[in-house]
């Protein structure tokens, strides 16, 4: 039997949806909207029965408090008209119910999408609080770090490069991109940061990513890069002791393995050797040495592969220079350990989950410089 809270949420959704003109999705029918409502009920019932409704965010409020806030409070002006509230509500519920659906579309927001997926999986109450804050009233929210995340995204209409990225993910990721570079506004439509009138491109460099990651999670993360390893190697050539320096080539796979054994994930930048430009008719047709952020999930020593979540959610192999296997349509991929280790250029991990002396099932393969 459904609880009073669940029925209240569905009731609020019903009242909103009856006034949704035009339909939520162009061309949808009443039957399709009823199917959407039933899927929403299933998702809400699952969240309630699993106890997720009562999970608390960093302010002590529950996940259901954020859902009710989103359903009842005044929205930030650009989202106030229907189908804004209806669409945002069910997209948030589905993102929490099934975080695997979170992706970057064809935008250069792989880093922000990785953080969004991580937060929705690991701290759904905090994720819901942040989304509710971004879309209600002033369009801003205080993160765990005490810093403000601000929503400047003012359009819910889909863009061709959104692909399967939903409206909530677009709002969240655009706000993250804006925060990561406080002195360079981000434009979601053209997918770029602006320095004055100059579009300097999309994506996040490692310092910007680290700033965003620590602000969102409230945790301390350690970042290592190929450059750190090269400097350590150079110092070692002058007789400086560098054995205690964490080396991404030597230790990277071990870090992923130890983190996974303690139910933690690692953020990794892979430098993809070459790839067809994913944007139709865009120039150049082939891109080379492109950085791409993924979440490393675990190491399978038996099959000698690293499992990872690709925020592109590819439906086919989309880059060259390494073997990769797709396990589903939601970004679960795997890559041979040797290839993954060779492509790693940056890694952000929780330092308390890695110890050099820890017993390893198998050693990581050193990078060949």
Question: Each PLM stretch: what is its role?
Answer:
Residues 5, 12-13, 52-53, 212, ...:
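Short, aromatic- and cysteine-enriched interfacial helices/patches
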Residues 193-232:
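Active-site cradle of extracellular carbohydrate-active enzymes
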Residues 114, 118, 213, 231-235:
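Hydrophobic, Leu/Ile/Phe/Ala-enriched alpha-helical segments that form helix-helix packing faces
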Residues 4-10, 25, 221-369:
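Active-site signature of cysteine proteases
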Residues 8-18, 22-42, 51, 58-199, ...:
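Active-site nucleophile-adjacent alpha helix/oxyanion-hole segment immediately C-terminal to the catalytic cysteine
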């Amino acid at each position: 039997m459904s609880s009073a809270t669940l029925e209240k949420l569905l009731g609020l959704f019903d009242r909103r949806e009856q006034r949704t003109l035009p339909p939520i999705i162009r061309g949808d029918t009443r039957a399709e909207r009823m199917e959407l409502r039933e899927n929403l009920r299933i998702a809400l019932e699952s969240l309630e029965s699993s106890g997720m409704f009562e999970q608390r965010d960093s302010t002590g409020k529950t996940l259901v408090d954020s859902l009710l806030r989103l359903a009842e409070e005044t929205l930030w002006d650009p989202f106030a008209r229907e189908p804004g509230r209806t669409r945002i509500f069910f997209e948030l519920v589905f993102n929490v119910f099934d975080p695997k659906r979170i992706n970057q579309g064809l935008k250069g927001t792989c880093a922000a999408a990785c953080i969004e997926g991580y937060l929705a999986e690991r701290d759904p109450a905090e994720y819901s609080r942040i989304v509710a804050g971004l879309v209600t009233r002033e369009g801003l929210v205080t993160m765990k770090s005490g810093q403000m995340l601000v929503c400047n995204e003012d359009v819910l209409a889909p863009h061709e490069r959104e692909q399967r990225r939903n409206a909530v993910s677009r709002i969240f990721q655009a706000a993250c991109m804006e925060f990561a570079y406080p002195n360079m506004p981000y434009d979601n439509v053209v997918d770029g940061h602006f320095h004055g009138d100059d579009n300097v491109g999309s994506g996040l460099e490692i310092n910007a990513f680290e700033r965003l990651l620590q602000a969102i999670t409230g945790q301390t993360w350690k970042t290592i890069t190929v450059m750190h390893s090269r400097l350590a190697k150079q110092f070692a050539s002058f007789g400086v002791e560098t054995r205690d320096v964490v080396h991404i080539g030597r230790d990277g796979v071990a870090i992923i393995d130890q983190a996974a054994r303690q139910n933690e994930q690692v953020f990794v930048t892979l430098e993809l050797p070459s790839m067809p430009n994913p944007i139709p008719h865009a120039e150049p047709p082939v891109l080379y040495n492109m950085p791409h952020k993924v979440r490393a999930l675990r190491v399978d020593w038996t099959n000698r592969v690293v499992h990872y979540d690709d925020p592109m959610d590819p439906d086919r192999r989309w880059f060259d220079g390494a073997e990769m296997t797709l396990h589903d349509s939601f970004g679960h991929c795997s890559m041979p350990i040797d290839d993954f280790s060779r492509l790693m250029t940056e890694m952000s991990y929780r330092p308390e989950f890695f110890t050099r002396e820890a017993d390893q099932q198998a050693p990581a393969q050193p990078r060949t410089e």
